[in-house]
């Protein structure tokens, strides 16, 4: 499938712009300046539209390609401010720090945790263990899941120090707080960021970071010869 058909700019320009924004802590205007220095004149609002469109495409392709998970998961929620209001990002990672899934919600409650865990179960099945913090909503969600026959073989652990990995993993996302304009755009942007970080982490785990290029990785993911 040609994901770049009908665009005014060449696909290489779009890939570089989207890759810069999702990989590095840059604003849309800063990406615009970097492209301008390379002789490419593109407005920051156009870059914004590209990021919103292709973040969702990349996340879908990444999820489709990576359906396996390890026996141990870590799940947590963090606060993200969007236009002055707090929202809640649920994230789950495996033992190597690779992102399994994310979910951005307006509320932090049992129903949101239940729905997210149910979605994880549908995608990956049951892990041997899940490590979370001691939030009451998570404990209630697990009880509700057990009552419908889900996660019956999974040990739910709430030892605080075991969850340090995912708490550290929140930081790059939270640094972008000031750029999130709505729940929808924040969700799209975070999906793109998680995809690129997931690719980076997987390459690091496999020992193939030498010569890492975000543009090349996006091309590979979208089926374009690198």
PLM segments and residue spans:
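Two-metal-ion RNase H-like nuclease active-site motif
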Residues: 69-82
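Active-site beta-loop-alpha junctions of metal-dependent nucleic acid enzymes
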Residues: 102-124
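Short, basic alpha-helical nucleic acid-contact segments in DNA-binding proteins
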Residues: 49-71, 148
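Helix-centered, glycine/charged polyanion-binding patches within enzymatic domains
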Residues: 134-191, 195-198
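C-terminal domain-tail junction helix/linker
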Residues: 188-195, 200-226
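Mobile genetic element proteins and their domesticated derivatives, centered on retroelements
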Residues: 17, 31, 47, 76, ...
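Basic, short loop/linker segments at the boundary and entry of helix-turn-helix/winged-helix-like folds
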Residues: 1-23, 39, 43, 48, ...
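DNA-recognition alpha helix
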Residues: 27-40
């Amino acid at each position: 499938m040609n994901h770049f058909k009908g665009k005014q700019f060449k696909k290489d320009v779009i890939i570089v712009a989207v890759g810069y924004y999702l990989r590095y802590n840059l604003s849309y205007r800063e990406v615009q300046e970097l492209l301008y220095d390379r002789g490419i004149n593109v407005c920051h609002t156009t870059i914004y539209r590209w990021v919103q469109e292709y973040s969702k495409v990349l996340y879908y392709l990444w999820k489709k390609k990576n359906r396996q998970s390890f026996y141990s998961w870590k799940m947590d929620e963090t606060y993200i401010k969007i236009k002055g209001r707090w929202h809640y990002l649920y994230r789950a990672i495996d033992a190597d720090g690779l992102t399994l899934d994310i979910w951005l919600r307006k509320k932090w409650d049992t129903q949101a945790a239940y729905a997210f865990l149910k979605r994880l179960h549908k995608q990956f099945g049951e892990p041997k263990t899940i490590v979370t913090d001691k939030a009451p909503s998570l404990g209630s969600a697990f009880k509700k899941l057990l009552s419908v026959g889900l996660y019956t073989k999974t040990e739910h652990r709430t030892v605080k120090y075991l969850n340090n990995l995912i708490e550290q993993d929140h930081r790059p996302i939270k640094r972008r707080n000031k750029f999130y304009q709505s729940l929808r755009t924040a969700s799209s942007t975070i999906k793109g960021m998680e995809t690129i970080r997931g690719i980076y982490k997987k390459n690091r785990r496999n020992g193939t970071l030498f010569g890492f290029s975000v543009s090349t990785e996006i091309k590979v993911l979208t089926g374009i010869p690198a």
